[in-house]
From Swiss-Prot:
Murein-degrading enzyme that degrades murein glycan strands and insoluble, high-molecular weight murein sacculi, with the concomitant formation of a 1,6-anhydromuramoyl product. Lytic transglycosylases (LTs) play an integral role in the metabolism of the peptidoglycan (PG) sacculus. Their lytic action creates space within the PG sacculus to allow for its expansion as well as for the insertion of various structures such as secretion systems and flagella. Its EC number is 4.2.2.n1. It comes from Shewanella loihica (strain ATCC BAA-1088 / PV-4). The keyword Cell wall biogenesis/degradation applies. This is Membrane-bound lytic murein transglycosylase F. The lineage of its organism: Bacteria, Pseudomonadati, Pseudomonadota, Gammaproteobacteria, Alteromonadales.
Amino acid sequence: MRSFLLILFCVSLLTGCQGERVDAAKAVETQPKTQLNVGTLYGAQIYVTTGQGLAGFDYEMAERFAKHQGLTLNMQPYPTISDLYQAMRNGEIDLIAAGLADTQSRREQFRLGPPLYYVNQVLVYKQGAKYPTDVSQLDDNITVISDSSFIETLAEMQKLYPELVWDQQWDKDSEELLAMIARDEISYTIADSTTFEINRRYMPELRAGPVLREGQAVVWLLPPNGSDQLMSDLLSFWHQEKRAGTLAHLNEKYFAHVKRFDYVDTRAFLRAIDSRLPKYRDNFVEYAGDLDWRKLAATAYQESHWNPNARSPTGVRGMMMLTLPTAKQMGIDNRLDPEQSIRGGAKYLSDILNRLPESIPENQRMWFALASYNIGYGHVEDARKLAQSMGLNPSAWRDLKKVLPLLQKRKYYKQTRYGYARGSEAVHYVDNIRRYYDTLVWIDNQNQQLQDEVMEAQQQTAEKQSQSEISAAQPN
């Protein structure tokens, strides 16, 4: 009898513990979700750290999606696509937002969200090499990233060209492979069109060969199971943002201005960053105020190529190419003095920004201000009124850049208060400054990364030296 009671007591203890574990598991399951965990890759158009914080098409969309769900965003960059896949399988992330294209292989492994934008796959080689007209008869292998959409494209092409071969890199990303092309370390790679267009501003030696696949949708990846509600929320969010013009705005912000490319100008700008910018950088930083100093520096390069003695037949002079009336208004005595010119240009640009209507979003105000700096505030206001009369959004840069060139046509400028203006030049002016700015941000990031690597190496060396000294001091 005593043994029976002892067994019954032990069973009741075990049952009670099991019940506590079940209740604890239920509590975890029912605990309200507070953050959206998103996996990503580093990339200028995906996720990047700038002096003004985080940026990137996927980052901005993920931030909006988290807000749409009432969650905070936890966006974690992973080293490779393979690592992203594994993190998804391990349940570490809710979705992947990393500029990845829609492929059959990914459809078989994950659920794919709606299209964010479209890209082409292009074969990339270095300037000076023969244009690769026939992919099946290249003089060297193609090097691509493992688990990328390019593998699927090459596998399909290999069915037609059995002799086609390629190398896979497991520890590199697209930007690293493009840099290897520029350094003559590899002969060919494949990149999506947006990545190529963005990176050739920093590596102007890159050249685009034939398009291997056209119009691939870039999508987000969701878990294959248990993601019905997340997919429903994502589709609702996508329709909302598309109607609001967010997708069009982000496409314009990250991709529109990089399509135009001038090899000679890009090379000259990169040289000027080394030879001229260091002389004036402190002035740009000092007088930028609330502006990003790199936008001010990019504007100065567009105006004068950082030449303090620049002159124009129209009467503008100096680093920031100020008119005499504007210089007087800004309190500038000598337009050819670089410090005064930068101070005056910064103040003038700041004044324009303050004049702009509040309806213009913060992230687009600079483009409106730069257009005004170029052709005058009144002409930009004329273009905004024209945009409104045409059913376009007068406070969206993507719409205003369509209307500005119309100020050169009599049919339109006769309707305006200030008349004719070279609006197409204003569009090119702003696009150029945006490209120069992006390049300055990229170079700053590269320099910071190099400094971090040097500091890490020094720290490791110091730790090894300290351990050696401790070992040497210990008695045998």
